[in-house]
UniProtKB/Swiss-Prot annotation:
GO terms under biological process: tRNA methylthiolation
Gene Ontology molecular function: 4 iron, 4 sulfur cluster binding; metal ion binding; N6-threonylcarbomyladenosine methylthiotransferase activity
Protein name: Putative methylthiotransferase HP_0285
Species of the source: Helicobacter pylori (strain ATCC 700392 / 26695)
Enzyme Commission code: 2.-.-.-
UniProt remark on cofactor binding: Binds 2 [4Fe-4S] clusters. One cluster is coordinated with 3 cysteines and an exchangeable S-adenosyl-L-methionine.
Binding site for [4Fe-4S] cluster 2: C144, C148, C151
Enzyme class: transferase
């Protein structure tokens, strides 16, 4: 039986998609060791030029090692054809065909099967296990109806559509019966869940919270305008993580307008302050170097960031994506300036995060942590605020949910003895 190795690039949604493919392998075995594999399946990411480059380099490397390489994911539409025509890939298949992976691997001839985004495909596979077992990523929707000027993802994932609530509940219930204690709700635009089905993410979360064995629910990312009063009521519940990732993308209205974003700084501030008042950690995304971000604009944006109650951030340098409105804008920012701004933001939020952790210690807030892995005599865990903890213990703690009352604040994480 031939062995298959999955190489997954990019987001949590891709991690779930890889599990869907793995679940559908009937005549092949999987391996976690790249060198053992006869077949390499690349689940690609195309969110930035850097992501494209990493995927391309890996595909070429595997082809040179005489591996049979198949290619799927968001990169199918941006570079799948080029890599296929140059002979690096045996086969290319879009998102619609993930569940046909077993048959595709048995094809003798080379093949290229693109996505048809008009058919609004949703997978039907039930994932029976997840790597790690204590935490699982659950895809609840696919696609995005936002039209942000810089973003290529709607053109490779299609318009927003939601999985049936019944299927999601069944999927989570199955995984929890096998030891999963925490789920992370993922998708292309998670907060749009239910819009096409007369529901919303808050109602889904309430129903998920009733599943036996599920102790904590995390949410991949939300847009500011997707957080309504019904969702805010959930902030009082113990089953919801005490960390929300809210995608602002910038903190200056001029840039939000240039990006064709739906949020604005005044309402963003009001929302974040409301959430922070419930003792929540808050993360966001931030794009530096988008066309139009002059020095004075960034200076004002940085001052706004300083005053926001943020604890986590995923900042990245603007990446020019072909055929997007932003790619036609001419008032670009130098890479040197973009890197300086990126580092300034990272440093700012690093200090905000440490201050937040110190405040929790001062308030005697116990950390509720799910222990994931053991390495070098220490256990690693994530607390309710999405902060890492290193735990020293002689006990078999893996997969345990702990309440840690005594801990130390270190530079980038907390330490505890249990």
């Amino acid at each position: 039986m031939k062995k298959v190795y999955f190489k997954t690039f990019g987001c949590r949604t891709n991690l779930f998609d890889t599990q869907v493919m793995s679940e559908n392998l009937k005549d092949f075995s999987t391996t976690l060791e790249e060198q053992e594999a006869d077949i390499i399946i690349i689940n690609s990411c195309t969110v930035t030029n850097g992501a494209d480059s990493a995927v391309r380099s890996y595909a070429k490397k595997m082809a040179r090692l005489d591996k049979e390489v198949l290619f799927t994911g968001c990169g199918v539409k941006t570079q799948g054809k080029e890599l296929f025509e140059k002979g690096f890939l045996k086969g290319v298949f879009g998102h619609d065909n993930k569940e046909k992976i077993n048959a595709l691997l048995q094809e003798k001839k080379r093949f290229f099967i693109d996505d048809n985004l008009e058919n609004k495909h949703l997978d039907t596979t039930m994932v029976s296990e997840f790597v790690g077992k204590t935490r699982a990523f659950i895809k609840i929707q696919e696609g995005c109806d936002f039209d942000c000027n810089y973003c290529i993802i709607p053109s490779v994932r299609g318009r927003a559509r939601s999985f049936e609530e019944r299927k999601i509940l069944e999927q989570v219930g199955l995984l929890c019966s096998k030891g999963v204690q925490e789920v992370v709700l993922t998708g292309t635009n998670v907060g749009s869940y239910g819009k096409d089905r007369g529901s919303n993410i808050a109602r889904l979360i309430k129903k998920l919270s009733q599943i036996a064995g599920l102790k904590r629910i995390r949410i991949g990312s939300l847009e500011p305008n997707q957080i309504n009063d019904e969702f805010l009521e959930l902030l009082e519940e113990d089953f919801l993580e005490k960390h929300l990732h809210i995608a602002l993308q910038h903190s200056h209205d001029l840039m939000l307008e240039r990006m064709n974003r739906r949020n604005r700084t005044k309402s963003d501030r009001e929302l974040l302050e409301t959430i922070a008042s419930k003792n929540f950690a808050i993360g966001t995304d931030f794009i530096v170097g988008h066309p139009g971000e002059s020095g004075s604009v960034f200076e004002k944006a940085f001052k706004n960031l300083e005053s926001l109650p943020l604890t986590h951030i995923h900042p990245f340098i603007y990446s020019k994506r072909k055929d997007t409105p932003s790619s036609l804008m001419t008032d670009s920012v130098s890479l040197e300036d973009s890197k300086k701004r990126l580092n300034a933001i990272k440093d700012l939020i690093f200090h905000k995060n440490k201050a937040f952790r110190q405040l929790q210690l001062k308030l005697n807030t116990p950390l509720k942590a799910l222990v994931e892995v053991q390495k070098d005599g220490e256990f690693k865990a994530l607390d309710q605020f999405f902060n890492p903890i290193k735990i020293k213990s002689d006990k078999p703690l893996r997969a345990s949910f702990l309440e840690i009352k005594e801990y130390e604040i270190k530079e980038r994480e907390n330490h505890a003895v249990f």
